[in-house]
């Protein structure tokens, strides 16, 4: 019973780390990466659709993304969605393909992005700590139901804390790597 709780906590903490990593991938650095456009929704035949379902996003070079739209009639909608996003991008139309040059980041914009990334990391840490709290409360419920001993509870709390520390360390490593990536010119 306690093993299941610990295993579940570890899986959920891993998912928190993955979610944090995915959120940080959306933050624009100086380099072109297809995941920059993952959060963009396109109005396609009256329905909000993720960009990757109406177009293929690729990298032309380190500062240019190319978006090949599957349906030529959706080019204007895709272009409008990219321009109205908060990424500050201006696509250039070339037939069924949109080329998106990525402007160099200013120092001020880099610092703003670092604040965003740090906030995402803190949200990840909070989620991991919430999983820890849930796991420990589940173990304490077992103790109240006389399904385990006080020593088992203490041992479980220590193990869950080790999982928590390890996963928070992963989030911190991801944050450090992203900050370095953002500060590269």
UniProtKB/Swiss-Prot annotation:
Keywords noted in UniProt: Cytoplasm, Protein biosynthesis
GO terms under biological process: cytoplasmic translational termination
Top-level taxon: Bacteria
Signal peptide residue numbers: none
GO cellular component, one term: cytosol
Principal location: cytoplasm
Protein localization: Cytoplasm
Keyword Protein biosynthesis: yes
Matching InterPro entries: Ribosome_recyc_fac, Ribosome_recyc_fac_dom, RRF_sf
Pfam families membership: RRF
Molecular function terms from GO: ribosomal large subunit binding
The family this protein is said to belong to: Belongs to the RRF family.
Role played: Responsible for the release of ribosomes from messenger RNA at the termination of protein biosynthesis. May increase the efficiency of translation by recycling ribosomes from one round of translation to another.
Designated name of the protein: Ribosome-recycling factor
Species this protein is from: Shewanella baltica (strain OS185)
């Amino acid at each position: 019973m306690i093993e299941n709780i610990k295993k579940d906590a570890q899986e959920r903490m891993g998912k928190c780390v993955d979610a944090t990593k995915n959120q940080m991938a959306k933050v624009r650095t100086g380099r072109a990466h297809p995941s920059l456009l993952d959060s963009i929704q396109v109005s396609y035949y009256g329905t909000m659709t993720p960009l990757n379902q109406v177009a293929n996003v690729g990298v032309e070079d380190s500062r240019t993304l190319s978006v090949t739209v599957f349906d030529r009639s959706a080019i204007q909608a895709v272009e409008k969605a990219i321009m109205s996003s908060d990424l500050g991008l201006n696509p250039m139309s070339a037939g069924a393909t949109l080329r998106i040059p990525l402007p160099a980041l200013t120092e001020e914009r880099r610092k703003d992005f670092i604040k965003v990334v740090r906030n995402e990391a803190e949200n990840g840490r909070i989620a991991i700590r919430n999983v820890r709290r849930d796991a420990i409360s589940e173990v304490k419920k077992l103790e109240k139901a006389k399904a385990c001993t006080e020593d088992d509870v203490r041992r479980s709390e220590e193990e869950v804390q080790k999982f928590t520390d390890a996963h928070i360390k992963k989030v911190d490593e991801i944050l450090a790597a992203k900050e370095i990536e953002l500060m590269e010119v």
